[in-house]
Amino acid sequence: MERPSPIADLGQGRTLVILAATLLATSSVGHTAKAAGDATRGEILYQGCQDCHSIEKNDVGPMHKGVVGRTSGTVPGYNYSPASRNAKIVWTEENLDKRLTDPQQFIPGTKMFYEVNNPKDRADLIAFLKEHRR
């Protein structure tokens, strides 16, 4: 004789609730949501970048206006390292995060060396840079 499922004894309504809860719990396994950055805080943090960078003009580093969505090594008038010029990486939020985490690992041979170790700081800086698209 076949034994009935313990879930069947709960009734259809409760079964659907359990099924929905299970699907919700398992759909988020392995996925981490990145918190949205705070552009206002990012602007304050960006002051630390201004030894080398500017939003509007090239300096020791290339200008950052329009960096989100731009391809690496393409700012007119900036003298890139061969590594950065040849990388041809599109500066998505994800790639900017990797670059800020460890510039030398992300593009070996790049001129940039400064690391931003705090994930919240990186998110805030990227939010600030997104406000300066073009």
Residue ranges and their predicted role:
Residues 26-45:
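Electrostatic cytochrome c docking/interface patches
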Residues 39-43, 54, 58-93:
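Gly/Gly-Pro-rich "capping" loops immediately C-terminal to redox-active cysteine motifs
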Residues 15-27:
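Bacterial N-terminal signal peptides
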Residues 2-18:
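Bacterial N-terminal signal peptides that target proteins for export
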Residues 49-52:
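Short cysteine clusters
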